[in-house]
Regions:
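Short beta-strand/loop segment that forms part of the nucleotide-sugar
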Residues: 1-6, 26-27
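Short, conserved SAM-binding/catalytic segment
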Residues: 16-20
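Conserved beta-strand segments of alpha/beta enzyme cores
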Residues: 22-24, 147-149
């Protein structure tokens, strides 16, 4: 399942020109955001397992071979960042603070976590059944509580283009995520 979140770089025309019957795609008319794209892909995917991977190649596709732990009983194989790549000091500090606040407010430890995961069908079904409107895939995929194995990777430089995540967008996303998972709100 390929999800094109309203890109304007020709990605969709390149993908749709290939005659591969094993690959299906969703093409959004505009950018609805990472979370919307991930959850739309999860709803449309129908395999025994589903991998979530960014297309900017900062998530190395060859790591999927190491996600074989899924066949050995892991229900989620999560790729965790051994190194964060070439992030600026401000971004690293912001990420570290955000993860600490998430852990303190929700007991979900996201240190080193990424959205790069391979999940069993029952995990995908559980995520698809959740009523959340403000989604945070990285946390929800941990919160649902399935058996998880971890594999490490080093974040590669972006293959092309620039991130659309400004500091302001990241800050708003962080506040929304923390308040959505605040443990007192769940009581």
């Amino acid at each position: 399942m390929f999800v094109d979140d309203g890109s304007r770089d020709g990605t969709w025309s390149f993908n749709s020109s290939e005659k591969r019957t094993s690959i299906r795609g969703l093409h959004f008319s505009r950018n609805f955001g990472k979370e919307g794209a991930v959850f739309a892909g999860l709803k449309a995917a129908d395999g025994d397992c589903v991998a979530v991977i960014d297309c900017d190649l900062q998530h190395p596709p060859e790591l999927l071979k190491r996600c074989i732990a899924w066949k050995n009983g892991a229900e989620v194989v999560e790729a965790v960042k051994a190194s964060r790549g070439k992030e600026g000091i401000i971004y690293k500090l912001f990420a570290k603070t955000f993860y600490r606040m998430m852990k303190n407010s929700s007991a979900i430890d996201l240190d080193g976590a990424s959205d790069y995961k391979l999940m069993d069908r029952k995990v995908v079904n559980a995520l698809n059944e959740m009523p959340e409107r403000l989604t945070f895939f990285r946390a929800l995929s941990s919160w649902v509580g399935f058996r998880t194995e971890r594999v490490e990777f080093d974040v590669a430089p972006r293959n092309a283009g620039k991130t659309k995540w400004s500091f302001r967008k990241l800050f708003r996303y962080a506040i929304s995520s923390i308040t959505s998972f605040y443990k007192r709100a769940c009581r």
